[in-house]
A protein has these predicted regions:
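Flexible, low-complexity linker/loop segments at domain and module junctions
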Residues: 1-6, 93-96, 290-296, 375-412
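Condensing-enzyme catalytic core mediating Claisen C-C bond formation in acyl metabolism
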Residues: 3-7, 34, 213-290, 299
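Conserved small-residue
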Residues: 8, 26, 80, 101, ...
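A glycine- and small-aliphatic-rich helix-loop capping segment at beta-alpha/alpha-beta transitions
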Residues: 20-27, 110-126, 176-179, 199-212, ...
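Active-site-proximal alpha-helical scaffold in enzymes
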Residues: 76-89, 139-142, 147-150, 156-191, ...
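Glycine-/small-residue-rich "gating" segment that lines the acyl/pantetheine channel
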Residues: 124-130, 171, 175, 192-248, ...
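Acyl-CoA/ACP chain-elongation machinery
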Residues: 181-227, 260-274, 304-311, 326-378
Length: 412
């Protein structure tokens, strides 16, 4: 099989709107939670989220692109632009059929759908609909628009597995290049879930933190007082490339995509398996796919969303797989970014890759007292980043429906 490497990175997120600022803020351990400004959330159980700040879409896209696309697709286009430019590959020097796009999203154009229903009701339920309504809502539109904008004519589809969507896309991109079906694939994830129906819906599930008096400390993964997750938004995009192709053109290589895997909990529509059975096997499959042993992994970027059930089951799963690895460090960066749903695996894979390139483990912020039920043999990095040599890093993502998506990266 072909080897696959990462040659480009791009991000739009609450922690930063380009890779440099994003990584700086992540390493610094800065919270990005604040009162929701996009709508009046005072009547909701949760009044806060991790919104993207200091960002003007017109600086990145033209008016027609903004008008015709849902916010999640706009985020994907902006992050893709940074990643593609970072990679530096030139389409005119290769076949357009050798470049594909595989993006993940959990909710797609959810905000567009919500607004159209609101307009429909406001117009007395008269059948007058925006002609862009349907394409704006489609979950595949991020991958479609990236290919249309840049002329990539290879493999193109979207992965939908809730909060595991980006890592599902990453696994697919890895395998298609391994199999010789593409030279380059633009991959990652995007979601824009900070809307009234989305916040209200997650409140109804009792999934979000209600710590309205202190939003900046609300997300506290693995802490004994955790009470739910912090909603985020944005996109992460990575350029995957066949190793020999990247070397031949003199590309900068961040890391190698070592392996990936997916399993299912087959347990519950929203809750993870309490003993982490699916997650355990998923991590084992990913290690096998990469040809690595558990004691070779230096860092796990945990899915850890700061929910009572999810964090505990994941900690048990990590301990079951890596319990004998005294070199392993674990951190939960959703404490800073919030939960980007279908984009979570993309930005967290970027964090894992940057941990490899820079030798830094970012912190889990806000966590003061680790839950005594969390296995004591796990080294969870809290409060501040640490310097550490990282040769292999793993990204965990788990989604509603029982989807477990795991990605492994290693130093070249």
């Amino acid at each position: 099989m072909k080897r696959v490497v990462i040659t480009g990175l791009g991000v739009v997120s609450p922690a930063g709107n380009d890779i440099k600022s994003f990584w700086t803020n992540i390493v610094a351990g800065r919270s990005n939670a604040a009162k929701i400004t996009r709508f009046d959330a005072s009547g909701f159980k949760t009044h806060f989220a991790a919104e993207i700040k200091d960002f003007t879409m017109l600086d990145h896209l033209d008016r027609n692109e903004i008008k015709r696309n849902d916010l999640y697709t706009q985020y994907a286009l902006v992050a893709a632009k940074e990643a593609i430019e970072d990679s530096g590959f030139e389409l005119d020097k290769m076949s357009p059929f050798d470049v594909g796009v595989i993006m993940g999203s959990a909710q797609g154009g959810f905000e567009t759908f919500e607004q159209q229903v609101r307009d429909y009701a406001a117009n007395g339920f008269q059948p007058h609909f925006n002609p862009f309504f349907i394409p704006k809502t489609l979950v595949n539109m991020a991958s479609g628009l990236i290919s249309i904008k840049y002329g990539y004519m290879g493999i193109n589809f979207s992965a939908v597995s809730a909060c595991a969507s980006a890592n599902t896309a990453i696994m697919d991109a890895l395998n298609y290049i391994r199999w010789g079906k593409a030279k380059i694939i633009i991959t990652g994830g995007a979601d824009a879930p900070i809307s009234e129906a989305s916040i209200g819906g997650y409140n109804a599930l009792k999934a979000l933190s209600n710590r309205n008096d202190s939003p900046e400390t609300a997300s506290r993964p693995f802490d004994v007082d955790r009470d739910g997750f912090l909603m985020g938004e944005g996109a992460g995009v990575l350029v995957f490339e066949e190793y020999e192709h990247a070397v031949a053109r003199g590309a900068k290589i961040y890391a190698e995509v070592a392996g990936a895997a997916m399993t299912s909990d087959a347990y519950h529509i929203t809750a993870t398996h309490p003993e982490g059975k699916g997650a355990i096997q998923g991590m084992k499959y990913a290690l096998h796919d990469a040809g690595l042993n558990a004691d070779q992994v230096d860092y796990v970027n945990a899915h850890a969303t700061s929910t009572p059930v999810g964090d505990l089951s994941e900690s048990k799963a990590i301990s079951a797989v890596f319990g004998g690895n005294n070199n392993l460090a674990v951190s939960a960066t959703k404490s800073m970014t919030g939960h980007l749903l279908g984009a979570a695996g993309a930005i967290e894979s970027i964090i894992a890759i940057k941990a490899i390139t820079d030798g830094i483990i970012p912190p889990t912020i806000n966590t003061q007292t680790i839950d005594p039920e969390v296995p004591s043999n796990l080294h969870i990095v809290i409060k501040e980043a640490i310097n550490k040599k990282v040769d292999v890093a793993l990204s965990n993502t788990f989604g509603f429906g029982g989807h477990n998506g795991i990605a492994l990266f290693k130093k070249v």
